[in-house]
From Swiss-Prot:
InterPro entries: MTA_SAH_Nsdase, Nucleoside_phosphorylase_d, Nucleoside_phosphorylase_sf. Gene3D superfamilies: Nucleoside phosphorylase domain. One of its GO terms (biological process) is L-methionine salvage from S-adenosylmethionine. Substrate binds at G78, M153, M174, E175. One of its GO terms (molecular function) is adenosylhomocysteine nucleosidase activity. PANTHER family: 5'-METHYLTHIOADENOSINE/S-ADENOSYLHOMOCYSTEINE NUCLEOSIDASE, 5'-METHYLTHIOADENOSINE_S-ADENOSYLHOMOCYSTEINE NUCLEOSIDASE. Belongs to the PNP/UDP phosphorylase family. MtnN subfamily. The keyword Secreted does not apply. This is 5'-methylthioadenosine/S-adenosylhomocysteine nucleosidase. Catalyzes the irreversible cleavage of the glycosidic bond in both 5'-methylthioadenosine (MTA) and S-adenosylhomocysteine (SAH/AdoHcy) to adenine and the corresponding thioribose, 5'-methylthioribose and S-ribosylhomocysteine, respectively. Also cleaves 5'-deoxyadenosine, a toxic by-product of radical S-adenosylmethionine (SAM) enzymes, into 5-deoxyribose and adenine. The active site is at E12, D198.
Amino acid sequence: MRIAVIGAMEEEVRILRDKLEQAETETVAGCEFTKGLLAGHEVILLKSGIGKVNAAMSTTILLEKYKPEKVINTGSAGGFHHSLNVGDVVISTEVRHHDVDVTAFNYEYGQVPGMPPGFKADEALVALAEKCMQAEENIQVVKGMIATGDSFMSDPNRVAAIRDKFENLYAVEMEAAAVAQVCHQYEIPFVIIRALSDIAGKESNVSFDQFLDQAALHSTNFIVKVLEELK
C-alpha cells in the first residue's frame, strides 16, 4: 500500500526518514519528498513547511505526483483539553480552521465557504489508531477535534477566544485543516496524529522549544505502529 506521511518541520520528519529503507529524496517547489519502504508499505514522507498555505500547496503536489492511497499528518501540536499533558498524543476525529470567520454570511465559525464546517478523519484509520493506542502504556493517547490556524497559540487571550468558539477541542496547530481540506477535495482518506509539545497559552513558546523533539519521537513511534497494523 502507498501511504503518505506529512510533517511540517525537519524535527517532525527526521526520525521517520531515518527508518525508511531504500530512501530517495527529491525537492519540488521547495517541498521535500522522500520515498522509501517501511512496515511493508511504500511510504512517501513529505516535509511540507509550516502553515496552511505551505501545507495545502505541498499536499496538492503530493496527491497529484505520488498518488498515495491514504494520508497521515504527523508532528507536534499545542494541547487544548484540560486533561492533556506535554507528550500526549491526539488522534483527529475532525479537523477545523480556527482562524476563519464568515459568520456574517451565515456560515459556521471556522467554515470556509463551499466547504463543510469540519473535515472528518477516515473512520477506518481512526479505528486503527485507536487499536494501536491500546498498547500505549507510558503516554496518554486520546481522540478528538483538532483545529488549525496560522498563529502559534501563546497568547492566553487568543486561547480563551478559541475556547469560546469550539467545545471539546483537544489540540491546535498550523497545518492539519489545510491537509484535510485538500484530502477532502481529492477524496483521499486521512487522519491527523499529533503529539503535544506544549499546552496552548501556558508559556507555549518555552515548552515548544524544550519538548519538540520528545513530541516528534512520540508521534513517529505511534505512526510506525499504525503502519505496522495497516493492511
